[in-house]
Amino acid sequence: MYNIIMYAIQFGIAVGSLFNEKLRKMWRGEQEAVRILREKVEPNAQYVWFHAASLGEFEQGRPLIEQIRKDYPQYKILLTFFSPSGYEVRKNYEGADIITYLPIDTVGNARRFLRAVRPVMAFFIKYEFWYNYLHVLQHRGTPAYSVSSIFRPDQIFFKWYGSGYGRVLRCFSRFFVQNEESKELLSKIGISDAVVVGDTRFDRVLQIKEASKKLPLVEKFINIDATDRKKVFVAGSSWQPDEEIFLKYFNEHKDWKLIIAPHVIGEDHLKTILSLIKDKKVVRYTQATEENVVEADVLIIDCFGLLSSIYHYGDVAYVGGGFGVGIHNVLEAAVWDMPVLFGPNNKHFAEAQGLLRDGGGFEVFDIEGFSLLMNRFAEDEEYRTACGALAGAYVESLAGATNKVLSNVKL
């Protein structure tokens, strides 16, 4: 059944590529993957293979990639993606020697791909469970590790009808899981080789903090050198339901500067944001100058790649997505020692639950709750600072997963 599904997906991507640009990139990338390997793989080199579904999973695996590259330079790095949103952004990443799409998990694709590269070990990030690739690796005696994986009782592996697909888990040499619950769930189905290491994203956000960029236009906007400057609210990866809440509040409160980095930066969405803002001077980042940004009340970030550095300038952060499919990266904000607000769809995000538990994160359901929180942060600086310190301490306390993984791997 699994292989039938894989062939159906492959057929669907092929047909869809005729009409959809994203699927077209995926289809072409998958078709070219083995050719790229045959051209670029060095016959006598030893390759460590990392597979990430998309950009978020890549960021989880990145600390591990870079630590191996630093400590074990004798190995080459192969990095694969399933999604164009990962590959297209990171296809020129300098931390890997070869970067390709991963062809759909059919028996033939897996055999061809692994004949072309023959890695000495493989790391699959978080939710990547590709049976045919893993089965070929296992058959060859190649260690395969699941990194930053997290399991819940409602997943198919732990249902009475999921035992067949659960075979894929037995192909891994070891699991590096995020929490004890995941380890216990694996134990219940007879998998004992699991180590609780935490989430490598904590290491990654600390790396990002260390490498953060100074942004002169943002510093001008917040009037960074003024002793009486306004507080700064940063909304990261926001969607319209998020924006409708916080903009309603800020339309009535003039004592904050507001930076909005929406998840979607298309013109239609930017126009919607502008329509929600009342009686404030607004500047887009791509149109900002040292002159006009100083007088602005709202700075809209209409380009990618700046958000993790922009959080540095905030006093309170809001991370979007919690009124939709799920919140975005709260750790990028929390690492900067400020309170982090987010919507209610956060239950499957361990880092959000941890921030809520430790007092550095706050759940927002509506404008009334948002207003109560923001009013207190505005009026009680000691409280706001203390909550921010708790957020930062939470991130620091859970760093170190990368070293724990490497201490359990033979390189």
Spans of model-derived segments:
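Hydrophobic beta-strand scaffold residues
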Residues: 142-144, 258, 282, 340
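Donor nucleotide-activated moiety binding/catalytic core segment of transferases
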Residues: 201, 283-324, 329-330
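Structural alpha-helical scaffold elements that stabilize or flank donor/cofactor-binding regions
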Residues: 113-115, 168, 292, 310, ...
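Active-site and donor-binding regions of nucleotide-sugar-utilizing enzymes
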Residues: 14-211, 215-217, 224, 234, ...
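Inter-lobe coupling/hinge segments of SF2-like helicase ATPases
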Residues: 202-206, 224, 233-287, 295, ...
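Short, aromatic/basic amphipathic alpha-helical patches
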Residues: 89-94, 188, 270-279, 354
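Catalytic binding pocket for nucleotide-activated donors in carbohydrate/polymer assembly enzymes
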Residues: 172, 188-189, 307-393
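C-terminal alpha-helical cap of glycosyltransferases
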Residues: 398-411
